[in-house]
Amino acid sequence: MSRVVSGRPPRIALAQQGGLVYSDDYLDGWKWGFEKIGCEVREWDITPLHNIPLSRNTIYSARNWGDLPRGFARQILEWKPDLVWVHHGRYGIHISQYIQEAGVPIACYLCDEPYETGETMLYAPRYTHVFTMDHCTIPLHKGMRGNDSVFYLLPGVNTDRFSPGKHQRGYGPDGVFLGNASLVPRPWFFRHLESATNGKASLGIYYWNTVNKQHPGWIGLDKYPALLSSAKIGLNVHRSPSITEDCYKRRVMSGRNARTVLPEGFKFCSKEPKEWGTGFWNDLDLPASHINPRFFETGALGVFQISDSNRSELARLFPDSVVASNPEEFVEKFFYFLDHPEEREERAKQCCDLILSRHTYKHRCAEILLRVGLWESIPESLSSSLGLQGDWTHTQSFQSSPETSSSEPTGHSNSATQPTSRLLTPTSGTTKPNGSQQVRRL
């Protein structure tokens, strides 16, 4: 359905859901990225569509709501876009048929995979193209769609907002986490660290509990860079993708999915995982491999950070990143790097340089245009600012088994837990931070 656009800027319609919690950085990034590569961009807030109930016959449900979805589609189509881009995708399905009937491709970005795959696998087939932040979900989505227009695409950064040197460094807490610290396994890591500091270091955990944008202590996107830059060490622990107890009992074991036909080789979760996680709609208990936005944003600011070792993509794309496989190791590395500022800054600069050269939303949006066929190649005017295309486009070839569950972490490779470091020669009694001499391609 996509047509190559040449001789004029591509027109990208952003159908955004402004009410999403923790997606402001994404929404800001897509607009910035498309504009920076020369696209004409216009936004539509489709949040009112969330009132339309979702059902298996979504188009029927939408039509029962009269002109609301049709009106949004008409407004968008009057602008004559080359692509409609829907972040998250859950409510964009109400306009997807109208958009495609007019001959315009519509793509969604699945930003909460694999935690929501029990739902996304049902509505993603209604889009022309699907982009997922986690390659572990690609086989499922391809199987549900019956075609290959499914692509792996990580989050990125808006470097007008997240870049080094713009904010005062290191004046705040020694360690800072920005996000929902109540999600497993973060409490184990951060409570252990909090106990170990015991006055020896200061921590800023924002937030210990689930909050929304109406919360009086809500920290808006404009404040992210200054807050993260204030720390000596950024704290980053990825959520566990394992199915939640509520999802297992209310969605899977209740027979709710009895009418859903899965692709060959896939099956719904049939036994309790070793530990309940945060996959509130992860009905198949799929594993996770992706790197979260927090890593890219903290790194782009030039702030050193410590992450958990449960994500294979972190080990593959950032082999010199410092990771910990358990709370005890997390604490050990926190104090080691707190006491070694020069080594900390050298690691931070390496990570920052790599993010700024390969992982901005300019790179992500350029890749989108290539994948959907609006560009045949990168315009010559952008080649110098984006760098070599092979360095920043995502590989789409991964060996993954549909039998794999979240109880089999994708991140515990040797490179993630036992690499050698070219940067540090720890003295007796210190932990040797992980790293390697390789810079891997996307």
Please tell me what each predicted stretch does.
Residues C111-M121:
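Ser/Thr/Gly-rich flexible loops in soluble cytosolic domains mediating phosphotransfer, phosphorylation
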Residues I99-E113:
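Active-site proximal beta-strand in glycosyltransferases
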Residues E332-L442:
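C-terminal amphipathic helix plus adjacent low-complexity
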Residues P293, S325, H359:
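Residue-level signal for the nucleotide or nucleotide-sugar donor/cofactor binding architecture
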Residues S321-E328, F337-P341:
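Conserved acidic donor-binding segment of nucleotide-sugar-dependent glycosyltransferases
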Residues L77, Q97-Y98, E116:
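Catalytic alpha-helical scaffold of carbohydrate-active enzymes acting on polysaccharides/glycoconjugates
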Residues A73-L77, F337:
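Short amphipathic alpha-helix with an adjacent loop that forms part of the alpha/beta core around
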Residues S2-D67, G71, W79, H87-H94, ...:
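Nucleotide-sugar donor-binding catalytic core of glycosyltransferases
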